[in-house]
């Protein structure tokens, strides 16, 4: 389990405010690795980077904080603090569903706000509310691009941020001025992450449970059938541990026809390989993002077709729900729209976008009451009682976050 990241930290904020550049400044790794993204320059699927935080035993704080093995200031070998997985969530408004499913994997978050634009931008607002709704408590604000604004604008931007975070989970968050492009104040940011975003206590003795955020076929077109690798799923363990050779179950699984009806069947397979932080492992635990090789037909896992599933020890996973009753907690205002619109009560018959763990599905409200509602899902979700879910409603051409529900 050594070499594995201990914690997932989300990078959230408006498009082009520098989330991916910040990852690069911290790690030397671009998270925009999917070809379609690099073309559009936007992180579409959740981008991941594992970063090792280290500390020089000789230098004073904050200069002692680094990601380099040899201190650039004094040449001393640095000491390992911990390995962290950064989840780079897309800042484009049409990709809010991906941001919400990523928030399910976050133990803490860094909200990136560019100093050269007025704060808040629409997605800055939407992402902060999403963190609030999903219940991510430990937040740090990075005021980025300070190298391209005047001192006056930097201070004005700081005041705008302070005003904007009032009454949210980031009200007391430290605000760190940074230039991701120049690498300025990255040491202070690492120090702040170490102080503010602690590794949560995890239960490794419970049955393994993993939220699946990606799934793919790693075979090249035209590969020899004898050498084909099985399908791969990627995501984060929230409890327990997985070992090579373990049997796993994946729910809700795949859609099959049974007696002329469409139904869902969970998948069972054996773990053939585990990868975390770019290294092969025999065993993985919670924290960080892991790739799990299986014996599944790669056609079942290609192009993220299993993302949103829950995987783990067979027979221990939450039930697959096609409908549920939820307690509803609505925000006062719709987030992300230009005009401030009041959130109307949920109505019978309306469709809602529902994020359950890493699943995004649409639920139609069968019956709505003052503080709870019954919904029927278009795509089933593997979810337990008491789980928090994000609720969005169609406003104009977009889904907008309106609050959260708790499954009853």
Swiss-Prot record:
The lineage of its organism: Archaea, Methanobacteriati, Methanobacteriota, Methanomada group, Methanobacteria. GO terms for molecular function: GTP binding; GTPase activity; metal ion binding; translation elongation factor activity; translation initiation factor activity; tRNA binding. This is Translation initiation factor 2 subunit gamma. The keyword Zinc applies. Heterotrimer composed of an alpha, a beta and a gamma chain. The keyword Protein biosynthesis applies. Residues 13-20 are annotated as: G1. Residues 4-201 form the tr-type G domain. It comes from Methanothermobacter thermautotrophicus (strain ATCC 29096 / DSM 1053 / JCM 10044 / NBRC 100330 / Delta H).
